[in-house]
Every structure is written in C-alpha cells, then in structure tokens.
Amino acid sequence: MHDHPASPRTGATPDLPAGTPTPEQDMGQTRALLLEMARCQSLDQIFRLVAETFAARQDVALCRIWLLEQTEPSLCASCRHFYDCRDHRQCLRLAASTGRSRMDGHVWTALDGEHSRFSLGLGKVGLIAQSGTAYHVDDVRPDMDWVTSPDWIRQEGIRTFLGQPLVHRGRVLGVFAVFSREVQDAQAMDRLRMIADYLAVSIANAQAFEELNRLKR
C-alpha cells in the first residue's frame, strides 16, 4: 500500500484491464485535452471540460475541482466542517464535479452536496491545499483515517486517489482530484500535473482580470 506525496516510481507497468488506454494513448488524450482547454472562453467551461473528460474514462469514478476562496461568516456558520476547520478565513469550494455511481447509475454533478466545501487540512483534499503537495494513494481502504466517506469508498470500489494542488507562482489556488476504481501508476500523476498546471494558470489569469476590473470601477 502506498499513501505518500507523489514521487517518481519505477517498476513494471501493471496489466491493463480491457478498455483501458495504453500510456501512449493516455498521453495523446492529455495533449488533446490541453488543446481543447485552450479553446475554452471561461473558467467554468474549462472546469466542466476537464471533469467530464476524466469522468468519461472507464476506470474513473469521480473527478472534482475545488477552488481555494475567502469565506464569509454566513457560510462558516452553516458549514458541516465548522468545528473541524482550522482557518475560518478561507476554504475549498467545489467548482466542478462529474462521475457516475456503479451502484445505481446516479451522476455526481451537484456542487452543493456533502463535500462541496473542505476546510484546510481536512481529509486528503484539505491536506493537499494546506501543504501544496500532490498525493497518490494506490490502495485506498474505507478505514483510512483521511477517508471522509468510507461507505462510498467501499460501495464504489475506489482503489486509487490522485490529487494535485493547483499552484501558480507558489500560491495554492485549489485542488484537482480523481477517484479511480483501478490502480494508477506514476505516469497518471504526471498527466494530472500537466492538466493541473494549466488549470492553475487559467485561474490566476481570471483572478487577475477580475482584480483589474475591480480597480477600474
């Protein structure tokens, strides 16, 4: 079992289940996704494109993107993580979600559910935002202390968690995470890093544009 910050790993490539893309196909799909992201005209379009593209993979159960934002007192007061939160000044807000249950076919696209907000340091997602470190857990178990929904992990057969911080010039802007029903190798983390880097630049540019407009008013 591996539960660690992402790092280069060596070894034989695991057997590929039927329908799973080869590493070469994966890289080609990643490049194609980056080109499509460049054509998007808004952050929401980019987020939806990324989440839907990853969730369309046979092995992916859920793909999500959270943004790190300043919080408001009214939001904190009603947040289910209020008493676990270490910093009531900012938290992660779910900005994109796509996935499908293998149990009943339910599609996970809602942005206001149980995990629509994460406090810094809570679970793997919150830890990634707090530390700015990518995490690759390739033997996920429901009883792991960072798992916030053990029943979901068990029922959906989640085997791997891949999480990348969205970092621009040393500043964490959010978290990009994928929950897979198959074991993923280090190359999968590399591909996620490429997408995460583009996401971070897009977010930073959008924030800079918003700040410029605010100063002009």
Where are these regions (language model features)?
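Signal-transmission linkers at sensory-effector interfaces
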Residues: 1-45, 49, 56, 173, ...
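Short amphipathic alpha-helical segments
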Residues: 28-35, 40-56, 62-69, 73, ...
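GAF sensory/regulatory domain recognition
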Residues: 52, 64-116
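Short loop/turn segments at beta-alpha junctions that line or gate ligand-sensing/allosteric surfaces
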Residues: 114-122, 131-149, 159
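A short, aliphatic-rich beta-strand micro-motif
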Residues: 124, 159-167
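Short hydrophobic/glycine-rich mini-motifs in sensory/regulatory modules
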Residues: 164-176, 189
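Short beta-strand-to-loop transition segments that serve as allosteric relay/switch motifs
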Residues: 174-184
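Allosteric cytosolic regulatory segments
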Residues: 193-201
